[in-house]
Amino acid sequence: MTISRNDLIQGVNEDNGLVELLAELLMIPSDNPPGDTTAIAAFISDYLKGHGVEAEVIVTKPGIANIVATIGEGDAHLVLNGHLDTFPAKVGEEWTVPPYSGLVKDGRIYGRGAGDMKGGLAALLYCFAKISQTNFKGRLTFTGTSDEETGGEWGALWLLNKDDRLHGDAVLNGEPSGLTVRIGEKSRVSIILEAEGKAAHGSFAGYVGVNAIMKMVRILPLVESLQGTPAVFTDETRALTEVVMKGYRKQYGHESETMANVLKEVTVNIGTIEGGSEDNIIPAYCKVTVDTRLPLGITPAEITEMMKVKIHEVDPSIKVSWKRPPQIVTESTYSGTGER
């Protein structure tokens, strides 16, 4: 069947199937943790089968199910990607409706993961099924991945390393983006700083013992000084960043310049500090977790080395390590545009 682009869009606009699909996805819990996506992957498989598309459910770990389906032929290859798991619906949250109700009311739909990202997942899945009924040029792959909320090791990363169907010319990711098209996101590097001291009774502070918290306090300004480290642009990545900044300016209004500049520099958030057991004991240990976000042109290894050099100039006893080693899929936070 051949259908025009306009007819396809009109058909989607007149059909309530997308809303119904999203409601059904919301009624299937896929909280992570624990991360069990068996039921939602099975539902998607049946949904695609109902549209004449065979999908493969890939279990990478007990309870961790991913789903992949490919249609079409040819060299040009677009991948549609969304994740199946959601942030947990925690006890004590002020829900006005049950979190797995999929309730549609007054032009809105309610449920855990409606925004992140079962809304995007439903849109990709629905369009994939619709396009499968048409004659189109090239290949189209749908991937529903798991484990996104806890790092992706058993979801997207596993599939990228094991399944060539995910290696397309481009990927359209359904993550919420403020209704603007985004070309990527800043790389996240979570770094742990650890200081060791020597415990003693608090009444002897300054005479005996070594306060690990104070050791950490002295180096935290050095960590924060990495805030604003500028990106290292090529001509291409500078041009792409400027395009995305235009979207930020439109989205954030009067704060546009400030918000847009976040794409040009490193951000540093000293997120957690742990240390000490009682206020009358000199703390023997202190741990700080730092969330750094990288612009184009700066690698995880480079920012960690910058931090380590600054810290060790003042206190070489501070341990600097990864919370979880970054999973490198490409050598940069940006891999360049394709030829097509």
Model-derived features: positions:
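Short beta-turn/strand-loop junction motif enriched in small, turn-promoting residues
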Residues: 41, 53-54, 177-179, 275-278
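Metal-dependent amide/peptide-bond hydrolase catalytic core
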Residues: 2-6, 30, 190-340
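Active-site beta-loop-alpha junctions enriched in small/polar residues
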Residues: 31, 83-85, 145-149, 325
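Fold-level recognition of mixed alpha/beta catalytic cores in primary-metabolism enzymes, strongest
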Residues: 106-109, 114-115, 119-249, 260-266
